[in-house]
C-alpha cells in the first residue's frame, strides 16, 4: 500500500472515529432519560443558542425520503464505494484539495451509514439557532459531508491554474 493510500485510509478512519465516538458519548450520556428527546446541554449567547439534544433520523438530510430508507442506504453505499475507488484506484495524481474534499465526503457518508447498520437510524445531536429559528439537528458526519461538498464545489468552479514548465 502506498503512503498516499495509507494516509488516506488513516484520515478517513480518524474522521469516522470522531463521528462515532461523539454519537456514542451522546447516547451513553442520554442513557435511559424519560424524555424522548432530552436536551443534554444548552448554551446561549444573547439570541444565539447551541444545544446537544439527540434525535433520530431515518431519511436523508432534514429527514427527507424517510419512506425510502433502504433505497437511500443502497445509494449511500454506492457513493462510498465510488469515492473509495476514485481515491485508491486512480493512477493519475489528484490535487490535495480535491482529495481532502473526497475524504471528508466519504468519512461523513461512512459515519452515517454505520449508524443505519448499528442503530437503524442516523443519530443527530447538534442544534444551533437564533431567537426562535433553529437549524435542523445534525452531527459530525453531516459537518464532514457539508465541508467536503463546499470544498469540492469551490475547487470545480475555481480551479488552480497549472504552472507551465
From Swiss-Prot:
The active site is at 124, 142. It is found in: Cell inner membrane. Pathway: Protein modification; lipoprotein biosynthesis (signal peptide cleavage). GO terms for biological process: proteolysis. Its EC number is 3.4.23.36. Keywords: Aspartyl protease, Cell inner membrane, Cell membrane, Hydrolase, Membrane, Protease, Transmembrane, Transmembrane helix. Pfam families: Peptidase_A8. It comes from the Bacteria. The keyword Hydrolase applies. It is an enzyme of class 3 (hydrolase). GO terms for cellular component: plasma membrane. The chain crosses the membrane at residues 9-29, 69-89, 100-120, 133-153. PROSITE patterns: SPASE_II. Belongs to the peptidase A8 family. PANTHER family: LIPOPROTEIN SIGNAL PEPTIDASE. This is Lipoprotein signal peptidase. It comes from Chlamydia felis (strain Fe/C-56) (Chlamydophila felis).
Amino acid at each position: 500500500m502506498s503512503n498516499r493510500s495509507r494516509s488516506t485510509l488513516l484520515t478517513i478512519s480518524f474522521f469516522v472515529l470522531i463521528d462515532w465516538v461523539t454519537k456514542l458519548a451522546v447516547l451513553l450520556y442520554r442513557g435511559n432519560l424519560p424524555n424522548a428527546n432530552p436536551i443534554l446541554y444548552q448554551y446561549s449567547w444573547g439570541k444565539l443558542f447551541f444545544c446537544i439534544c439527540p434525535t433520530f433520523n431515518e431519511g436523508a438530510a432534514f429527514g427527507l425520503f424517510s419512506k425510502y430508507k433502504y433505497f437511500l442506504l443502497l445509494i449511500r453505499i454506492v457513493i462510498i464505494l465510488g469515492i473509495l475507488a476514485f481515491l485508491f484506484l486512480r493512477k493519475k495524481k489528484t490535487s490535495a484539495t480535491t482529495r481532502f474534499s473526497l475524504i471528508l465526503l466519504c468519512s461523513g457518508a461512512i459515519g452515517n451509514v454505520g449508524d443505519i447498520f448499528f442503530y437503524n437510524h442516523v443519530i443527530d445531536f447538534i442544534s444551533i439557532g437564533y431567537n426562535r429559528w433553529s437549524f435542523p439537528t445534525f452531527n459530525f458526519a453531516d459537518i464532514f459531508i457539508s465541508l467536503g461538498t463546499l470544498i469540492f464545489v469551490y475547487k470545480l468552479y475555481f480551479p488552480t491554474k497549472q504552472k507551465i514548465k
